[in-house]
């Protein structure tokens, strides 16, 4: 689409094809010290999981060594990881939270 101005300049609109943002999964990693109830609370508070879903994810973390909390664009995933790590440290728990590109 061309736009012509009074001074004779012509501007051409260039079509841009935006690719979707890279997505990252946020994972909680198992440890032998963080209470299961704390993990459930983290999943409810930071990932908006209901109690049943949070409990299922917590059991997956306990059984399999890690559990997926959700999949988000990079900035959101990074923010969630930092929030979880800060909360865990303040509570005195060694809970690990990481993100991986999907």
Curated annotation (Swiss-Prot):
Q: What species is this protein from?
A: Herminiimonas arsenicoxydans
PANTHER family noted in UniProt: ATP-DEPENDENT CLP PROTEASE ADAPTER PROTEIN CLPS (PTHR33473:SF19), ATP-DEPENDENT CLP PROTEASE ADAPTER PROTEIN CLPS1, CHLOROPLASTIC (PTHR33473)
- Protein's name according to its UniProt entry: ATP-dependent Clp protease adapter protein ClpS
One Pfam family hit? ClpS
Matching SUPFAM superfamilies: ClpS-like (SSF54736)
Report the domain of life of the source organism. Answer: Bacteria
Q: Which Cys-Cys disulfides exist here?
A: none
Q: How does it assemble?
A: Binds to the N-terminal domain of the chaperone ClpA.
What exactly does this protein do?
A: Involved in the modulation of the specificity of the ClpAP-mediated ATP-dependent protein degradation.
Quick one: a GO biological-process term for this protein? protein catabolic process
């Amino acid at each position: 689409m061309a736009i012509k101005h009074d001074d004779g300049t012509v501007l051409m609109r260039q079509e841009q094809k935006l690719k979707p943002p890279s997505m990252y999964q946020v994972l909680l990693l198992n440890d032998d010290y963080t209470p299961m109830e704390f993990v459930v609370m983290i999943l409810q508070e930071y990932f908006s999981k209901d109690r049943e879903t949070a409990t299922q994810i917590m059991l997956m973390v306990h059984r399999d060594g890690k559990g997926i909390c959700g999949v988000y664009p990079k900035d959101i995933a990074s923010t969630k990881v930092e929030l979880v790590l800060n909360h865990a440290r303040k509570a005195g728990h060694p809970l690990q939270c990481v993100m991986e590109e999907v």
